[in-house]
Curated annotation (Swiss-Prot):
Substrates-to-products reaction catalysed: 7-aminomethyl-7-carbaguanine + guanosine(34) in tRNA = 7-aminomethyl-7-carbaguanosine(34) in tRNA + guanine
Binding-site positions, substrate: 94-98, 148, 191, 218
Residue positions of the active site: 94, 268
Record keywords: Glycosyltransferase, Metal-binding, Queuosine biosynthesis, Transferase, tRNA processing, Zinc
Organism (species): Thermoanaerobacter pseudethanolicus (strain ATCC 33223 / 39E) (Clostridium thermohydrosulfuricum)
Origin: domain of life: Bacteria
Pathway the protein takes part in: tRNA modification; tRNA-queuosine biosynthesis
Protein name: Queuine tRNA-ribosyltransferase
Length: 375
């Protein structure tokens, strides 16, 4: 028995957008889907009950951070990540590759794996593809990621080629080490920087290994948006239709719509929660910095068109006051709204695909939000 099952329900007639159902050991997910990020086994400031109320069906957690603190063995003793954090819906864990490679001066890469120093206390650690699988097996997530090297942008061709080869070797090793295939699905991660031939080669070689799903990694790391979209377009072309596709670390409203148009099913990003804590919210008419002075006497909701808990109950003036007073509730209310906005956006995208109106929906959304239709 496979851990997950993807069913393609409908394809958009004018784009590569797909409507699907992803069955996991912890529930059914309608795709395309946005996954809130709970790095430390918590989506910052939100309870699991609140996440359910806003419609989250799957969240993401982070292997690197949970390995360092509290430790995967402790989470395993607790009965796995779902029990530990009291979340009974699906969880996806990333491999920690992106975090380890972000450490730069604190890490050293070999073919065996990566030696790195903890950002918490400077202690030395060594991640191999097998170790990363062992950690994720202990966490018990529904969907796991292979260990990959995330090349920086820009990077020269030879470096990215070596990096891609390493990612493929590590994917093979990780797949061999994965013990719990009936309850946890392991995705391969397509790398290759912004080089089209490397992306194509990496995708084809990973597809030959027959993973239950595929991630597109190494994007949204500083490259221009049109380059990212071109690479996504090219990559999805080489991925099987009957498996889910996940674009890692992408979550602004325009990127979600553009990603779906190019055949992506799953997205995650810290953006909505991070900007919420800084007093910035998404609205149907674009971003709004609620802590700014003009909102001191604005008693309207964050977004007139939103029916989230925050917009039903609180005004811009009140939320601005909370931010100015450094009250914890400010971040909570803004986070609830931002996550609800993106989850609702995905719902509207799915409905647009159902009705074959995705391009019309994009046009209307972009115009109202203030995006230029460049792509």
């Amino acid at each position: 028995m496979a851990a997950i099952k993807y069913r393609l329900i409908k394809k958009d007639s004018r784009t590569n957008a797909r409507l699907g159902i992803l069955e996991t050991p912890h529930g059914i997910i309608e795709t395309p889907v946005f996954m809130p990020v709970g790095t430390q086994a918590t989506v910052k400031s939100m309870t699991p009950e609140e996440l359910k109320e806003i419609g989250a069906t799957i969240i993401l957690s982070n292997t690197y951070h949970l390995y360092l603190r509290p430790g995967h063995k402790i989470i395993e003793k607790a009965g796995g990540l779902h029990k530990f954090m009291n979340w009974d819906r699906a969880i996806l864990t990333d491999s920690g590759g992106f975090q380890v490679f972000s450490l730069n001066s604190l890490r050293k890469i070999t073919e065996d794996g990566v030696e790195f120093r903890s950002h918490i206390d400077g202690s030395r650690h060594f991640f191999t593809p097998e170790k990363v699988i062992e950690i994720q097996n202990a966490l018990g997530s529904d969907i796991m990621m292979s260990f990959d090297e995330c090349a920086p942008y820009p990077a020269d061709y030879d470096y990215v080629k070596k990096s891609m080869e390493l990612t493929i070797k590590w994917a093979e090793r990780g797949k061999r080490a994965h013990k719990n295939t009936e309850k946890q699905a392991l995705f391969g991660i397509v790398q290759g920087g912004t080089y089209e031939d490397l992306r194509k080669e990496c995708a084809q070689r990973l597809v030959d290994m027959d993973f239950p799903g595929y991630s597109i990694g190494g994007l949204s790391v500083g490259e221009p948006k049109n380059v990212m979209y071109d690479i996504v377009d090219l990559t999805t072309e080489y991925l099987p239709e009957d498996k889910p596709r996940y674009l890692m670390g992408v979550g602004s409203p325009d990127d979600l719509i553009e990603g779906v148009i190019r055949g992506v099913d799953m997205f995650d990003c810290v953006l909505p929660t991070r900007i919420a804590r800084n007093g910035t919210v998404f609205t149907s008419k674009g971003k709004l910095i609620v802590r700014d002075a003009p909102y001191a006497e604005d008693f309207s909701p964050l977004d007139e068109e939103c029916d989230c808990y925050t917009c039903r109950n609180y005004s811009r003036a009140y939320i601005r006051h909370l931010f100015k007073a450094n009250e914890i509730l400010a971040a909570r209310l803004a986070t609830i709204h931002n996550l609800y906005f993106l989850i609702k956006l995905m719902e509207r995208i799915r409905e647009a695909i159902r009705q074959d109106r995705l391009l019309e929906f994009k046009k209307q959304f972009f115009k109202k939000y203030g995006y230029k239709e460049e792509y």
